[in-house]
Design a protein with these regions (language model features):
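A helix-boundary/hinge signal
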Residues: 1-224
Length: 224
């Protein structure tokens, strides 16, 4: 990292709260422009508030654009299956590793994947031999191994939750100071105004804890 310098001419400054009053002064001081939300970073929409369904629209549009460039009707079901797992799922992989996608967005993405699998690029509806959630089951459970986006979303957020609980880094300490404080993570609840990332972690925690149990052991670390 030695020798790297910030190019302020290619940078933008984002101000929050009281700092917005002096935004122009800060921008002049650093010699860069002022940025405004929302922005897109590595394909991920970033905003100072929770994103609306309309702002998730670009995710659906990217998937549709990719599908429109394929000749699905010329592919076998096996060929479509490979494209769904290797391309379509990976297009949203980075995003679902950071945010809990809204149900409406997940259903729409599944609709596009299902339609491509059964119909190719044909607009004419074709009879589906089984439900999409059956197709998404592992092969040893009677499915075709298509990645279930909701399950994958939860698993990827679960990795961040595990790192939050087991590691001691900069981002972990920042989140703990802001949201956890002196409480145990099991006592922390989501509140309106919390970041989208934290909301996803809390939803994942709630899901995991509903399937888990606690062992008191000697009770030395148990809080009442």
């Amino acid at each position: 990292m030695l020798g790297l310098k910030i190019n302020f001419h290619k940078s933008e400054l984002f101000c929050f709260g009281e700092a917005q009053d002096d935004a122009n002064l800060y921008a002049e001081l650093f010699g860069c422009g002022l940025g405004s939300f929302p922005i897109s970073y590595l394909g991920i929409p970033i905003h100072h508030r929770r994103l609306t369904l309309a702002e998730w629209k670009h995710v659906e549009e990217r998937l549709q654009k990719r599908l429109s460039s394929w000749k699905g009707k010329l592919l076998s079901l096996g060929g479509r299956l490979v494209l769904i797992n290797s391309v379509l799922t990976n297009m949203v992989l980075y995003m679902i590793s950071f945010f809990q996608l809204p149900k409406g967005v997940l259903h729409k993405l599944d609709y596009f994947r299902s339609r491509f699998f059964w119909q190719g690029d044909s607009e004419k509806k074709k009879y589906r031999l089984t439900k999409w959630n059956v197709v998404c089951r592992p092969k040893d459970q009677g499915g075709l191994g298509v990645h279930d986006l909701e399950v994958k979303n939860r698993a990827l957020l679960g990795k961040w939750l595990a790192r939050l609980l087991t590691e001691d880094g900069v981002w972990q300490n920042m989140l703990k100071r802001k949201y956890v404080g002196s409480k145990a993570i099991s006592q922390v609840l989501w509140k309106p105004g919390d970041s989208h990332f934290w909301a996803g972690l809390m939803a994942t925690k709630k899901h995991f804890f509903s399937y888990g149990s606690f062992s008191i052991e000697d009770g030395s670390e148990i809080r009442f």
